[in-house]
From Swiss-Prot:
Alpha(8)-beta(8). The alpha component is a flavoprotein, the beta component is a hemoprotein. GO terms for biological process: cysteine biosynthetic process; hydrogen sulfide biosynthetic process; sulfate assimilation. The gene is cysJ. Its EC number is 1.8.1.2. This is Sulfite reductase [NADPH] flavoprotein alpha-component. Signal peptide: none annotated. It comes from Zymomonas mobilis subsp. mobilis (strain ATCC 31821 / ZM4 / CP4).
């Protein structure tokens, strides 16, 4: 800017300038960029209502800037948050960006992309998140085009406690390269404490693209600043700033002789204004069991009074372990590090065998590893092994149309024994055992736009949810009841025993009597010699299920275990489509994929 320009008076009276500052306070980089383009378009006489580009003077022949496509493939919202932050970074660098959920992406046109930046999580046994399944299948099919004119970079999220850590990111990265794409940067695989890695990757990507891609003007940025991606949340409460709520009900809903301990949890949100929809999850921040902490400290020869630094704060070790570190779930890196620090021969043998290491980490809690292997560590050494505490997510089991300022959960309490020592899950035992009624807990809503009731209240729905997977379908039924929805509803539920494990039995029976629940099919796996599961019940009703899908336009929903149940249900549905629709295996699989793309087959599996 020249000196003369810098001395030019601001062409706004103080009152108008104050109004402008008021309007723009608190806006994101993306929103400010859009407003900038909108106003520039107004000044040029362009039609800004459709975010069209202002007409350039005839003497100017600007080069059309490259559009950078960011694909967000998120399961719990973390990948989407990173993608949104990356979008804002690139917009601030005056680059043209299109951020889109992978589930909304027209992937058959992928070969037209110049730059793809993908942020993806991983679910189940190394599988892509639900919204990216159709895209994943397309990329790995014979239909996938060459990407010889496309550059890419991938940021993969995962959890090191699982064998196939960040596998989806690995797969996408490898496939982009196999199709001829140019890798801009090495793939990043990030664990649950991903924040620093994500920030570094975003910075590296932005700096690289600033040099590689011509910048766009404000109006061109505005044309892509508003893009078809669901923002994570507009609530003041989130993972980093949770709501302090109150536990109002903790009721066991399995029988006294059941092998399962399932709790119906009700949480009072007060007048917080926190809103959720059926299909969303509730994030619960928990604290570790003081007895577990004491056991770890005693085994390591520590008092708990030692001072350690956590996020720039100095805390007593025992307090830090209770509030800030994961103590219940082991992982392979921790086992390897503990073996190195203690030089324990048995652990050293285990870590030399990848399969043995994975099995040991998955089946041996941290405290039992310490007990079995022995060894003394300093406070700093111990916490250096541990991952930060992360919230647990639970499918919400209520509709606010029914329960208003409450949120309900269906929590399966994890309990087991190791060498005669009783162990329990960190979050589930916190809710079931350690949090008193009327006690406070920190919560937030994790929105899941990939698990929603159909917009049309007359559309039929088929709900498949064994065990605690039935939770969101309780919310679905409450919502449809309050909406006066006329669509048919069909529930498939399963558990070991009818007498002990029929969760919410009275409610389902009332919905049947009312006529809201058209059908309910029940699978009790241990009430007879031959085990019966929900997938068996699906096959028994193949003809009617096919009629609901093909003729009535039914929506299918699956919730629960990703490792076994969800795959078995997938296989059963493909068998039904193949058998009743007269298709071969490949055509049936494609039919199910089309249902996904139409949002008529949705899964919430974990």
């Amino acid at each position: 800017m020249t000196n003369e320009a810098s001395l030019t008076p601001i062409p706004l009276p103080a009152e108008k300038l104050a109004q402008l500052q008021t309007v723009t306070n608190g806006l994101s980089t993306a929103q400010i960029a859009w407003i900038s383009g909108y106003l520039w378009g107004r000044s040029s006489g362009a039609d800004t209502t459709n975010q069209s580009l202002p007409t350039s003077p005839a003497t100017e022949q600007p080069v059309e800037p490259t559009v950078i496509t960011i694909l967000s493939a998120s399961q719990t919202g973390n990948a989407r948050r990173i993608a949104e932050e990356l979008r804002d970074d690139l917009l601030a660098a005056h680059l043209k960006v299109n951020l889109i959920n992978t589930g909304d992406y027209k992937f058959k046109q992928i070969d037209r992309e110049k730059i793809i930046l993908m942020v993806t999580s991983t679910q189940g046994e190394g599988e892509p998140p639900e919204e990216a399944v159709a895209f994943y299948k397309f990329l790995f099919s014979k239909k996938a085009p060459k990407l010889t004119h496309t550059a890419f970079a991938v940021f993969g999220l995962g959890d090191i406690t699982y064998e196939h850590f960040a596998q989806a990111g690995n797969d996408f990265d490898r496939r982009f390269e196999e199709l001829g794409g140019e890798r801009l940067l090495p793939r990043v695989d990030a664990d649950v404490d991903y924040e620093e890695a994500a920030e570094a990757w975003r910075k590296e990507v932005t700096e690289l693209l600033e040099k590689r891609v011509p910048s766009a003007n404000s109006a061109q940025i505005a044309a892509t600043a508003i893009s078809p991606v669901d923002e994570v949340s507009s609530t003041p409460y989130d993972k980093e700033s949770p709501l302090t709520a109150t536990l109002s009900v903790n009721q066991k809903i399995t029988g006294r002789h059941s092998d399962k301990d399932v709790r119906h949890i009700e949480i009072d949100l007060g007048d917080s204004g926190l809103h959720y929809k059926p299909g969303d999850a509730l994030g619960v921040w928990y604290e570790n069991d003081p007895a577990l902490i004491r056991e770890c400290l005693d085994l390591l020869g520590l008092s708990g009074e030692e001072s350690i630094k956590v996020n720039d704060k100095i805390l007593p070790l025992a307090q830090a372990l209770q509030q800030s570190f994961e103590l219940t779930v082991n992982n392979t890196r921790l086992v390897e590090s503990y073996a190195t620090l203690t030089q324990n021969k048995a652990l050293e043998k285990i870590i030399s065998d990848k399969a043995a290491l994975q099995d040991y980490a998955q089946n041996t809690p941290i405290v039992d590893m310490i007990r079995q292997a022995g060894g003394k560590l300093t406070a700093e050494q111990f916490v250096s092994l541990l991952r930060p505490l992360t919230p647990r997510l639970y499918s919400i089991a209520s509709s606010q149309a029914e329960v208003e300022n409450e949120v309900h959960l269906t929590v399966g309490v994890v309990r087991y024994e190791i060498d005669g020592h009783k162990r329990a899950g960190g979050a589930s035992s916190f809710l079931a055992d350690r949090l008193a009624e009327n006690g406070n807990l920190r919560v937030f809503v994790e929105h899941n736009d990939n698990f929603r009731l159909p917009d049309n209240p007359d559309a039929p729905v088929i709900m498949i949810g064994p065990g605690t997977g039935v939770a969101p379908f309780r919310a679905f039924m409450q919502q449809r009841d309050n909406d006066g929805a006329k669509g048919k509803n069909w529930l498939f539920f399963g558990n070991p025993h009818f007498i002990e494990d029929f969760l919410y039995q009275v409610e389902w029976q009332a919905y049947v009597k009312q006529g809201l629940l058209t059908h309910i099919d029940l699978a009790w796996s241990r009430d007879q010699a031959k085990k019966v599961y929900v997938q068996d019940k699906l096959r028994e009703k193949a003809a009617e299920i096919w009629k609901w899908i093909k003729e009535d336009g039914a929506y299918l929903y699956v919730c629960g275990d990703a490792t076994h149940m969800a795959k078995d249900v997938d296989k059963a549905l493909i068998d039904i489509i193949r058998q009743e629709g007269g298709m071969d295996e490949e055509a049936a699989d494609e039919f199910l994929t089309e249902l996904r793309l139409e949002r008529r087959y949705q899964r919430d599996v974990y």
